[in-house]
């Protein structure tokens, strides 16, 4: 009797992760299932039986909000994903709600951009665009193109849920710092998903059937910076001789939570500012399907 194996494998990249935020990046890499995950919140309450009146924005940092309570005490809420970005000498709310935007120039893509953040991300409205992802920050930009015989698919966007209530839970969970874009079956039995969390984005390649190989290539165009491949498979984005961001090494997970770092990464310079990134996941591990 023939049995059909039902499984998926995920090859994941944490893209454009700020070097200074290695701990959040490590935590993200341990989230083995694809999709949006909730903010983890820890709170420190200095009073009992009180409710939130307002936020004291002067006490903000990247991960923390402080709330004034009805009894005059304070509540500090710390989040696992950045909720603020720094601009013009103040911490502002991150809003990663994705909204439609047409191409601004001849080389731009039509897609969806995050509303307010220290980093601008734009995701293609469909696989027909010249790139799946564009990132702009601090005087440089990076675009990310899947080089393959792609199927024609539209982007599936998941935005943060609106919190319209005034309860303490609504206020504490009202951040809009996580969203996602998925290209379902952009390759045969393969999805590509981008999860935007704070100022970082994670790419999941979800493989839903066994393949002859697990090799994926991306053309990366960089303006105002350069890419440097490290021995551990990570890639530094270097500007003015300094590493400003990094793309950590790819890894694999499956539906059962198994993990493997057996992924080969190559980076070839095609021309000035244009690179070909190729990742090849271990075939034996990839074909070891779970029932």
Show where each model-derived region lies.
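Intrinsic disorder/low-complexity segments enriched in polar/small residues
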Residues: 6-7, 23, 163-164
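C-terminal segment of classical bacterial N-terminal signal peptides
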Residues: 19-28
